[in-house]
Amino acid sequence: FVLCTDIRIANSKAKLRLPEVTLGITPGFNGSQRLPKCVGMSKAKEIIFTGKMLTAADALELGILNKVTEPENLMDEVYAMANQIADNSASAIAMAKAMINVGADMDIDIGKNIELGYMAACFGTPDQIEGFTAFKEKRAAKFR
C-alpha cells in the first residue's frame, strides 16, 4: 500500500516488497502501475519479476520513499512533515495534487493547460489573497 500514498516516510529498518510472483499471482492494488512511475519501467520489472526485498535505503535511493529516519524518530518526522504541509493553503494543496495526478500521464502541452486552469482557479480565493498579503507584509500566511 505504500505506493498509494502521496509522501512516503519510513524507518531505517523498514523492508518493502512486491512478493506476488513468489506466490504464483500478479501484483495487485495497482502496484504494477504505480511502481514504474516511481522507479522506471526496467527497474520496476526487476523488482516485480524477482520478488526482491528492498531495504529502506534501497527504496529511498530508487525514489520509492521520500525520507528514511531512525525508528525512534519516525513519528516526529511524520508530524513535522504533516505540520509543514498543514501550514499551507489546503485548497491550493488539493488543487496541486489534482493537477499533478491528472497531468502526470498527459502530453506536456496538455499538462501545461491543466496547470494554467488550476492556477487561474486560485486567484481571488481567500487563501490566495491571504498568501499574497502575507508575502507583501513579510509575515507567515494564516490560512483557514
Where are these regions (language model features)?
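Short alpha-helical scaffolding segments that buttress acidic/His motifs in well-ordered protein cores
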Residues: 47-51, 96-100, 135
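Terminal low-complexity tails and localization/encapsulation signals of metabolic enzymes
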Residues: 133-144
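Short acidic-aromatic low-complexity motifs
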Residues: 4, 50-52, 126-130
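C-terminal long alpha-helix characteristic of the crotonase
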Residues: 9-14, 56, 65-113, 120-121, ...
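CoA-thioester-processing core
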Residues: 1-49, 62, 77, 81
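Acidic, divalent-metal-coordinating active-site segment for phosphoryl/phosphodiester hydrolysis
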Residues: 52-58
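Hydrophobic alpha-helical segments typical of transmembrane helices
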Residues: 31-34, 43, 55, 95, ...
